[in-house]
């Protein structure tokens, strides 16, 4: 009897007006319990309410996600600040409202939806389910939806948006983030990620459409609506056909004795990399059996980010040794990024950094262009791009070879946007990259692409093998010709936003108000560029040429010794990242000296500017 009474009391509590003492929270609780139709996430909020956990309720319900460098990204779970059924429905309603305003032919052209293999049992939240709900919201409004019938690499969504002439698309993914996370990555009609003002306008529309519409929860529409189409076979076929544009040695590939191991990090990449190798004439790469199939728990790696290096590549490296394969290729869980490693003569593995791979890609794509260009092709119309925190090696190659190099803000959305401008003006973009192992060869896709990058590295390695040159040896040749570019990138974790803000504000008011530092330890600073405020001391008017980005922190220091160092916050994770590079001329070949100088400068940067002990920063652990 007592148990029944308690149950009745709890039931009454959950259906009565809420009196937490915080009117904003009371309203948010009521909205969530009325709107959420997912039993598991609804129960999470009910349990918090029942147990009087008002602080956690406030954290979950009284703030919303905002667009970062990769759209919406957060942990999966109950609450308006998390990725879940309700927030994805709200986001898609906002998307619909904005797209309806922007495109009079929205209901003729349609919308693309793709997804990876993430999922969380406790919130009954998976990428596939979120993709179906995204489609359902639009189908209920009579919008044609191209919903992939199975998981796909992230690059397939921007590719499909372009090829199908859709107005926009969404990929449900959190890429290489921890297993608890998911995301909502938005592409515009151009096939590039959205930039301002679209992101801000979409957020406004989301805030105006928070209550689910009739039909928004009806995921049965995915199975019954004649407006739902499956683009998988068509897009996969066209994508693989377009890959041939960046294949230059198919016959050589078919004869190579090199063997490759590929790991897809428990994600989507396996089938698509196998197909890409076939297109290029290769035998299939050897898959890592434990990591070949999708697994939302990423069971065999401590974090699903191949950028973390040898510690997360262990299974693939051991398999390569067993199979006598010299090159290991690792695509991240949504297959938009690539890591590569090569076995050296001393039996050790060389895991290439993103900047080192970019040096090889830059050399390779330009070399192939020179050998295959048409008679009237002009090198002055050729471009390569990189984000401003990435290596300057492409700049050095461009200066010597006569093509153009440009920098963009961090994030491939800026690269994609700039590529569109260049293509519209008759320019040719051969290659673009960001240091965090994001590469784009050619312009068939306007986002980073791990599938195409993997097979291009394989072709490069096979070509070099015919001359008895390894990837590492070719990298040295690139540096000897264009100048050594020695870089180091790492990060600190910081879970306190006020601490992050105070670190950067201190740098803006270092010795006195509105004065940036003139030295970092003993290292003299030549120029300072602050993207957050739009300041650049190297410009005559002291204004940055790159767009201002007030929502993120980013300061770049150029030193008198030729080093460039950037401190910035991550758009998707609680990190302060640092990027430092020594850019040497070709006559400076003492790498040990350059590395020692870089190490000393980084130590000074950390000690003087970040002050990890004082600020409670957590060192990256690998």
Curated annotation (Swiss-Prot):
Gene3D superfamilies named in the record: Alpha-D-Glucose-1,6-Bisphosphate, subunit A, domain 3 (3.40.120.10)
Entry's localization field: Cytoplasm, Cytosol
Claim: Protease is one of the keywords in the record: no
Location, primary (coarse class): cytoplasm
One function term, GO molecular function aspect: metal ion binding
A matching Pfam family: PGM_PMM_II
Residues the entry annotates as binding alpha-D-glucose 1,6-bisphosphate: 73, 175, 336-337, 434, 436, 448
UniProt record similarity statement: Belongs to the phosphohexose mutase family.
PANTHER family recorded: GLUCOSE 1,6-BISPHOSPHATE SYNTHASE (PTHR45745:SF2), PHOSPHOMANNOMUTASE 45A (PTHR45745)
Entry protein name: Glucose 1,6-bisphosphate synthase
Organism this protein belongs to: Pongo abelii
